[in-house]
Amino acid sequence: MATSHFTTPLAVDTIQTPPRRKTLSTPPDTPVYNDLDNESPAPKTAQKSIIEFPYDLEIARDSNGAYVEFGRGVWSTVYKATSSMSTGRPMMMMTPPSSPVIATSTSRVVAVKTPLRRDAHSILRAEAYILSRVASTSPTSGAVDQEGGYVVPFYGYIPSSNALVLQALPLSLSAHIETCAGQARKSFSTRTMFDPVTPNWRGLATQLIKGLDWLHTEVGIVHGDIKPHNVLLRPRQSPSSLQKGGEMEYDALYTDFSSAHFISSCTSTDDFPTGEGALTPPFAAPELLTLSAMKSATCLSTPASDIFALALTLLAAATGDVLVYAGTSAMQRLAMSREGWRALDYVRSGANASRLGRGRDGYVGMVVQKGIAREAESRPTAREWLDIFA
């Protein structure tokens, strides 16, 4: 199989953090989750229930014969590939549960996420376990290419190469924000200066908050590393979904679950450690960046820290500054991220303050402010956050 071996290198200023938070430089151990349907199975059980990819793959090459990459991250490289997937053929599971069926054409382009190094093998296997649970929970899991959904469709895991196969969606929210920001600078006017640089910002915010609510309440997982680079955009195809009441022309879908864990796994003991991969200033919540948090032996990322990360992702989409704190170094961003609840104060003093909306408490500012409350317990749940859009 073409994906069995890769030796070649998607993150921005990412801090790698181990499950026990002993140092910032050591990579995490294997993520093992102790919750399946609110039970605590033995570790060998946690290794099951993974959707397996049963089809052949061929990695795409450019004119020079090099593999074509969609992107790179802390643990992995994402390659462009093609696969012949028989129409209606079900994906295989490592355990008996019923399998989603992929409605396919003869050949399609897919994304193949492969480990960069040996210690990433367990990280990707754990991500495959998370994505298999997501796929089995999704109402669109039986037809993963249709519109809707909240997560990039997962086609399966390849055990021989520790690779994940997903729907190919080359456009990230971060790239879209940068494109929109460039266009906004070229066409700046007093008529539009109070609008977010990303068109249909409200629709984007609604999609992502609904998706986060679904992940937290229906699937029962924390994403752990939400940022513009970990949201992919899929163009909507049906005419009825376009130009309809100012809705987004894209489905905004979460990707990269290498730092995800089940919410109930935070009560795990030392027998069932939870692995978390990366924290990305400025999107990491301040409580995750304290010295005591780094030394903690328990789960750090929570639904509340996901809310914070999404709030700053939406702030970036409004201002056009993908890293929020424009013109700062990585060390400066880290220092400012430790007081991330002040992010709006920084933006208000900068060139893009008008993008928050008219007045000090403009619409964008109001939405973001709720999500970046200093104390985690003061932040709304995703469902409560949606009330702003009612």
Named regions from a protein language model:
Residues 136-157:
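Conserved HxN/HPN-centered segment at the entrance to the catalytic loop
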Residues 372-384:
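A conserved short helix/loop substructure at the end of the activation segment
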Residues 74-136, 140-141:
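ATP-binding glycine-rich loop module of kinase domains
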Residues 288-356:
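Conserved C-lobe activation region of Hanks-type protein kinase-like domains
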Residues 152-196:
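Conserved structural core of kinase catalytic domains
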